[in-house]
Amino acid sequence: MLKLLLGDPNTRKLKRYQPMVEEINLLEEDVSILTDDELRNETHNLKSNISSELNIKKQKELLEETLPKAFAIVREASKRVLEMRHFDVQLIGGMVLHEGQIAEMKTGEGKTLVATLPCYLNALTGKGVHVVTVNDYLARRDAEWMGQVHRFLGLSVGLIQQDMSPAERKKNYACDITYATNSELGFDYLRDNMATEIEEVVQRKFNYCVIDEVDSILIDEARTPLIISGQIERPQEKYQKAAELSLSLIKAKELSKDGIDPEGDYEVDEKQRSCILTDQGFAKCEEALKVNDLYDPKDPWAHYITNALKAKELFVKDVNYIIKKDEAVIVDEFTGRVMPGRRWSDGQHQAIEAKEGLKIQPETQTLASITYQNFFLLYPGLAGMTGTAKTEEVEFEKTYKLESTVVPTNQIRKRQDWADQVFKTELGKWKAVANETAEIHRNGRPVLVGTTSVEKSELLSSLLFEQQIPHNLLNAKPENVEREAEIVAQAGRSGAVTIATNMAGRGTDIILGGNSDYMARLKLKETLMPLLVKPDNEHKPPIPQQRNSKSGGGFSANVDSIANKNTKSGVDSLFPCQLGEDIKRKLSLLSNELVKNWGDRSLTILELDDKIATAAEKAPTEDKLIQSLRESLSEVKNEYEKVLIHEEENVRNAGGLHVIGTERHESRRVDNQLRGRAGRQGDLGSTRFFLSLEDNLLRIFGGDRVANLMNAFRVDEDMPIESGMLTRSLESAQKKVETYYYDIRKQVFEYDEVMNNQRKAVYNERLRVLKGNDLKKQVIGYGERTMEEIVEAYINPDLPPEEWDIDQLISKVKEFIYLLNDLKSEDVSVLSIEELKNYLQEQLRIAYDLKEAQIEKFRPGLMREAERFFILQQIDNLWREHLQSMDSLRESVGLRGYGQKDPLIEYKNEGYDMFLEMMTNMRRNVIYSMFMFQPKSEKVTNN
């Protein structure tokens, strides 16, 4: 009703941007007549003007005034460098981002290009801009591709990659615009706050940040905090013993009800992802291990057994992790990508290693941690882009104070979303998926099938193999990941079939008919790699054959209209045609030239990729070899385009890309992302989801209603079921899961919010020390506070002075400051409480000056070094212990809910007390250490 009365708020918002769009369009002609150098000068002048304004409010006003001109300049630079002109809707997207909102833009609407607008504008402040992507590949791609626009305009562009040294990181963070992944940014922030010298700090103060695929980073990854950890030794045989014991324990068929244990040794709660021993299970374990109590603090076992059971029941090989080089590597449940270097905490990873018979790595202890929620809230300016924000609008608003605005598409969407097909069994579903894939493939349309795990993608692959359908497999297995660019490049070709886990296509558009640009790059890589890249057994050949049918038919087996002599019947390799002799000869000459200059097999694969990527750019280059590489790349691309243009026409006529979803994801948003791969930029396309009543979502969250439905439907397994009640069950299950995970994220956020205030206080204190402006004043401040605390601890103001315990007080002061050994009770017995505090603080300052004089005799400046060392040492050690204590507190307050107490309030109150105690201990330890510090004489001694 409100919508009818007031109109759609989104439409009202968009109307507000229209006058600004018109102003930018009016400026287009004026800007287009400027030379390249004049455009760069404009940038230089704008930057000088804006960065010199120190008042933040006035600087913001200047940015608003500059916006139309800045956007017009970026649009012009993009036309010249990328041959891409920002549409009006993309200008609106840029304004939405500049205002610190989330821009929802559909797949293929050019989100990456939109980001150049607010990034350029905010970089004019000179304070730096971060563009955040979900993986290293996308960060590198965007820095190379969109970075051309910024470099052309005279701004510096940085890139942060996983294997960079601190010096390289510092240099890249100092650039005007820096591209990085969310995890690299977060870990650098934590490492900076563990630095022992100011020179080790790599990041600048945060300013403005644009997050690409914002939902993936701020929502999907928000349940998992970033943790830097150090190793601690734990007995490895306990993991092995627990793994063996878990195999003999029997799982209960149902969960306990009303406190009554079911039959069996343990119960599994898939929803909570937990395993709980029954009384029978406890007894069995205690007997097998010959112990009286699994929770005995001197010899604890419960934790090991629970982890072993979770490894057995809830962590599935090829779904949650894969084995690579004798290591268990985590697979990201949202993207389907492997996450090397990441490990599950609390001994869970060790339990999985024991289960798989792998070498057990040492367990770790948290040294520093932060959640993505609190990390990104450190940015004064935060914005994001995604294809699907509206489903999570409330969470963005509540947690991050980010509004969402839907930016209209440039062209009308022509995609058709076909009705879901639901099957009684999983097997029936997979057969139907294989049949529909085969049918659409035979019609000459490309098909993308999204699966939820490595295991499922391989099951479908075997079914298609039986039907003799050639296809490509893209999942977390290393041999497939290395072919990602190649597989996506040909996923839009006529009759192409691509099976992909959730990683499907984030950041890479599937172009109908095939991507000639990618294919040309890969052709050059295939040609140059054997000659230029160091031999390395790690790397598979870059272009392995696709999984073909026994008949040898290829993608285009039934499409006979590609009129080109060079086209093979059925694309049995990646490339659409054989290159002409002329181009082959040129490539051969180029190869010899490159070997002569770059060395015989002396580059890494990454270096070769970078050189080919640079050649693919349009930015001017002085490097003659890159120019030659660029010419060859262009010729190969043109040759391929001649063939692919026909193929594109055929694919369009056949109906475009068809996307098949094989399971509803826990979040409707991920389903929408998969659908969004089809019908980009007004293309034709279609989508369909195939589901079964045995799918995880329905099984775990569907409740009894779905179980009853299963019994009610007496239909064959390969007969699709259509039922309104079923569709409603499905939607309610998805909403239930979304709410469930939102509550978990909210809880993670609320608990980390308590830690966040403490973290800020500790990190600010550390930064003060690293900058070292006035360390002496800081330490004396600690001492004065300690003297106050000693007086308050030993003097009761309610008692008469003659009853005060002055002797104990003096004794305590001497414990901290041995230089005050001459201090006597009678010196202070006549003083009031305030006078006593002032007197002791005065004595402390005198003693500290005396100590400084002693230390400085050894070496000038040694006292300041000692102050920095002891403060940092105490902060780091006590903070580490505090993190452990807060973890334990969080676990224990959960039980207080049973006593009608709010666990979060208990956590806040006790956490605050523990934090105050930690800071008190830190001050006291520093004072004690400073007075006890005795440098070793630097005389040379003979041993």
UniProtKB/Swiss-Prot annotation:
In this chain, the stretch annotated as Disordered covers 534-561
A GO CC annotation recorded here is: plasma membrane-derived thylakoid membrane
Q: What are the subcellular locations of this protein? A: Cell inner membrane; Cellular thylakoid membrane; Cytoplasm
Q: Which family does it belong to?
A: Belongs to the SecA family.
Q: Which PANTHER family match?
A: CHLOROPLAST PROTEIN-TRANSPORTING ATPASE, SECA INNER MEMBRANE COMPONENT OF SEC PROTEIN SECRETION SYSTEM
Q: What does this protein do?
A: Part of the Sec protein translocase complex. Interacts with the SecYEG preprotein conducting channel. Has a central role in coupling the hydrolysis of ATP to the transfer of proteins into and across the cell membrane, serving as an ATP-driven molecular motor driving the stepwise translocation of polypeptide chains across the membrane.
Stated name of the protein = Protein translocase subunit SecA
